[in-house]
Amino acid sequence: MHIERLDFENSPYLGVYGFATDRVAVIREGLGEKKLATLREVLKVPLIETSVMKSRIVGIFVAGNSNALIVPWYIWDAELDFINAQLREYGIDMEVVPFQSRLTAFGNLILANDKGALVSKDFTREEARKIEDILGVPVERGVIADYTAVGSVGVVTNKGGLVHPEATDEELEWLSDLFKVDVYVGTANMGVPFVGSCMIANSYGVVVGHLTTGPEIVKIEEALGFLG
């Protein structure tokens, strides 16, 4: 099973509440065991259930790739300690970096895989260079379909990418070159263009909001490399 519909307390915006890499997934607290089991089965990585500043919208705040996770500088010490302890328990050697910036919604503002990263043009060039050092991949600043919240309007793994349907052909070519995967346009949750907010994905699988239609699922499967 590489794709599954799911809701988090009737919300179809799964990407707001979680984030996944090919090594670990960070998920909001308070989900039932049945949904956690589905996440484990689909994403095939350990789950860390946590909060950021006691907020459950951890997908808004956390970004990264297989090399590192970036979290807001104001994350509580207890939360940071818990994430690091969980990584150690799972035997995962991954840095978790509280990043100093006036921007904090990193899940909305950073789109990354293990080949490259796109960060919002709202980051300074110096911040982009620091993010490049943390994630260990080339970083570019920019927008997708005129949106600065590149993590909200896109999802990318090491197998493929899906972005806002208004992205241009030139943007798709640029993103494919940056991430070294094919990137398509599409929607989720019955026409929502903010695909990054609608799903949690890695190279092993993807969980999508429960409102996502059959045709949307086919497109998501194609874009993220699960067909053929």
Curated annotation (Swiss-Prot):
**Pfam families linked to this entry:** eIF-6
Any idea which GO molecular function terms this record carries?
ribosome binding; translation initiation factor activity
Q: Which GO terms describe its biological process?
A: cytosolic ribosome assembly
Which UniProt keyword terms apply here?
Answer: Initiation factor, Protein biosynthesis
| Biological role stated in the UniProt entry | Binds to the 50S ribosomal subunit and prevents its association with the 30S ribosomal subunit to form the 70S initiation complex.
Q: Which family does it belong to?
A: Belongs to the eIF-6 family.
| HAMAP family tied to this protein | eIF_6 (MF_00032)
Kindly provide the name given to this protein in its UniProt entry. Answer: Translation initiation factor 6
Organism of origin:
Thermococcus gammatolerans (strain DSM 15229 / JCM 11827 / EJ3)
The gene for this chain is eif6
